[in-house]
Amino acid sequence: ANKAFFELCDNAIAKDPDLCDAYVLKARRIYGNLFTSVYQHQRTENELLFHNLSFKAYSINPNNPEAVVMYSRSFNLKKDYPQRLKYARQALDLNPSHDVSNNDYGWALCNEKRFEEAEYYLLRAMEMNPIGRRSYEGLMPFLYMAMADSHKSLEWCNILYDRGSHSRYDGWRAAIYVHLGDFENARI
């Protein structure tokens, strides 16, 4: 699937080397691949490619919120959190009604431990895109753990578990139950 997708992007770039969206789409797919075990053997190569694609997209059109989000994520991977926050904010300023920019800015705020502020933007992103909100919900248990709100974290973890049980949710829920002092449920 990746090969065919990348070929389509490359064909679009060959026809128009300044087509920002083709670089953004390719960068977005590579970014997702960085966090899957299937592509870990290519992590270094893919990370470099992501940085190059996100920079290219941003240099073509710094007024495209999607390009700015990708560029922001490049700084996140480099652990340059002030730049990450700067560009995430730029993407949000370009289009405050863009769900991806709200989500990205929320997670950038987490790097600064500004969790309550982050919660606002993350929930806002979900409200803006009710059909795609599930793609934003997966990390919510961690946000609430960072906020020391174990009850809210458990609530989100249960929502995710009920949608599709996976052993990782059992582990997360056990850890949350321990935080809550409920050792009986932690053992289940």
Protein language model features and the residues they cover:
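Acidic, proline/glycine-rich low-complexity intrinsically disordered segments
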Residues: 1-128, 140-144, 155-158
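Alpha-helical linker/edge segments of TPR/alpha-solenoid repeat scaffolds
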Residues: 35-37, 146-153, 180-187
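TPR/TPR-like (Sel1-like) alpha-helical repeat modules
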Residues: 50, 161-165, 178, 183-188
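Alpha-helix capping/termination and helix-coil
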Residues: 113, 129, 147-149, 161-164, ...
